[in-house]
Amino acid sequence: MHWTKYIASCALSLSIGAIALAAAGQSTSPPLESKPAANTPISTASQPAAEEWWKHAVLYEIYPRSFQDSDGDGIGDIKGITSRLDYLEELGIDAIWITPMYPSPGIDYGYDISDYTAIDPVYGTMADFDNLVAEAKKHNIRVIMDYVINHTSDQHAWFKESASSRTNPKRDWYIWRDGKAPGQPPNNWQSWFGHSAWTLDPGTNQYYYHYFYTQQPDLNWRNPEVHAAMDGVLDFWMQHGAAGFRIDAVSRLFEDPGLHDDPYLPGFNAYGDRNIEHKYTDNFPEVHDVLKEVRRVVDRYPGNPVLVTEADEPSVEELTKMYGNGDEVQLPMDFQIADVNELSAPRFRGLFNQIENNSAHGQPEYFFSNHDQPRQRDRYGDGEHDDQIAKLMAVLLLATRGTPQMYYGEELGMRTTDPTRIEDVHDPIGKLGWPKEKGRDGERTPMQWNAGAMAGFTTAAKPWLPVPPSAAQYNVETERKDPDSIFNTYKRLLALRKSNAALRDGSYQAVNESDPNVFAFLRRSGDKTVLVALNMSSKSRKVSFKLAAKGVKGTGLTVLYCSPAGAAVSRVKQVELAPFAALIAEVN
């Protein structure tokens, strides 16, 4: 097919997308069900099964400090999120996962919780949260809470009681041990953030264990009272309208009761410690008992609540265990995919194939950016084709089978903007590991709403983190006006995903599996077959797709989405893809 004919096809695809969006109208997710009133007894019997809405949903992670400030203090808040629900609905989002908004000293910016059943005043009030849930429901958007299950803050009332004496009733709610000798911790276990995982409490002359910061003591999940208390946390937020939970650091819940030393590995970490294998503090089988328990609690509520886990497992086999027998979590986050830091067709193909063939036949959950890792634009961009690569990654995220999870600003092409001086660092990781480790501030900068000095995020003279210079070009207001922007690419793809049955819930099948440059696959539902082709190289590629071997009889292609213009597309044996091109086409 020649250039002019391709442009006509591409233009047609945009029209088809617009028609599909209009026809789709509202989100295809089922209407949200009413929550039980607070303090209403909930039957322990399972509720009637609701549609598995999370299989067709697109999740969107919000870091609340950075999304929208409503009161001019330079920090994002709940009212700010509520004010942007129209935007999220316009984009096509079905559910928002909000990172912790609970009261916290802020050592780890919310992941050190001092009260599980309240809202931190910096973000607002419980009334603000209830209003957010109610308004989100009007936009057919669900709200998923962050369930920080492994540890509390050392300022939590539970820990203060536990630390008050060796005989306190809550002493065993945390993990206390004697040192192996005066001035020496019980063993060599290391904190994820460097140095010993044990801190001496001088008042009781025992050490407490913390997988993360000193100020984040681990709960003792071998204590039934801890189970009961944390189940109460789930009940509280379910009764306030939560649609489910993202469970934090789930693989760290249990440790070796025998306190065996972890094996040392070669080299040193960013904090100067000898590297170790976390053999005795990770992935104990009892984790699955806790996940089953959490599932039983949330399943008492209507609306088919969803559980998402931060499960940075070392293999797809370990990740698969998080599904259980359909009685644990529905969506274990796939860090295998997210940790790929290069555009590699063979590597992505291999990982997608593995998770597709998981023995539990569970629903995949994919993401490429979050609040703990550099943004995808910086990890995959080559400095020359960054915008086009961002569009390719949008297709990879939204056209595969599974539940995609976006990170705020990803739809704009936001960059990671690391601090350049230690004096400007907020994240403790950066403070401890500078300059080798810059911390996570760079991926948590304010959402870029417009090209103004504060990017529309705040009216304050100084936001909590600086607005990146890239906000002048990459922002909602500017990109809305450009039909070929990254924002409009996401919007178009989200509409196509909702309107096309094959993309929404069709099967996945890789094709041309020996191609080192083009990652291609089929999505099939009934008599509909869609081909997705992604050129992950900086050179044009001519590709012939041999689909007959996959049971596909059609040889013609109708373009549904293509970027950039310049490919030659008419039949499966005559496809030319420009550098970093992304193509979605129906086979006929």
What annotation goes with each model-predicted range?
Residues 26-235, 239, 252-314, 447:
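Acidic/aromatic-lined carbohydrate-recognition and catalytic surfaces
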Residues 54, 258, 262-280, 289-304, ...:
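Loop/helix patches that line or flank the sugar-binding groove of alpha-linked glycan CAZymes
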Residues 569-588:
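C-terminal beta-strand-rich structural cap/linker in extracellular carbohydrate-active enzymes
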Residues 160-206, 340, 345-358, 433-468:
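Core domains of carbohydrate- and sulfate-ester-processing enzymes
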Residues 9-20:
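Bacterial N-terminal signal peptides
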